[in-house]
Amino acid sequence: MTHPYLARAWAKTGADLRVPAPGQAKKVALLGSLDHAIRELVVHTSPTKRSSDFIAHLEQLDRLYGPRPGQPFTPVVLVEDNGPIHTSKLALAALAARAHWLTVEWLPKYAPELNDIELVWRDLKAHHLAHQTFADPDALDQAIHQAVGALNDERMAYPLAKLRISA
């Protein structure tokens, strides 16, 4: 959003935690995938959050991880929640078209605590994008991509001793 996200702010009980900011509040939708092997976050931003935006993110994953002619490919597992943009007819058809290399594991409904990327979103908002205002959605979009780059650099600089296995 173009208005600031307030992380760890203090106020009296019942008080409104809004910071006055010029203009209207606009949002930028953020779709992403976390590559556990190299700890890289891959994001797609859009002014909307629709099935077509999810498919654009799948096409981004095609370019990064999809099979290439004449080369062996490594199967990929994509962990998804049951959000409407992931379960629409259009999205399910796009996932089915990639079934030869992309396996989808569905999380239970209303279980964000099981989705590792939710922790990344929280970190991105609280540590990289908090307490800032943006002139317009394009400035926010640019800040998101810079923050993701910084987050990826930070995660690459301090690798895990062993990979986390979600089960």
Give the role of each language-model region.
Residues 1-60, 165:
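Extended, low-complexity cationic-aromatic segments
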Residues 15-22, 96-119, 133:
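RNase H-like polynucleotidyl transferase catalytic core
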Residues 32, 39, 58, 81, ...:
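Mobile genetic element proteins and their domesticated derivatives, centered on retroelements
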Residues 58, 72-87, 110, 115:
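Acidic/histidine-rich, metal-coordinating catalytic segments
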Residues 60-71, 145:
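Structured catalytic cores of enzymes that bind and process phosphorylated ligands/cofactors
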Residues 89-93:
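Distinct, well-ordered alpha-helical segments
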Residues 117-167:
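C-terminal anion-handling pockets and recognition modules
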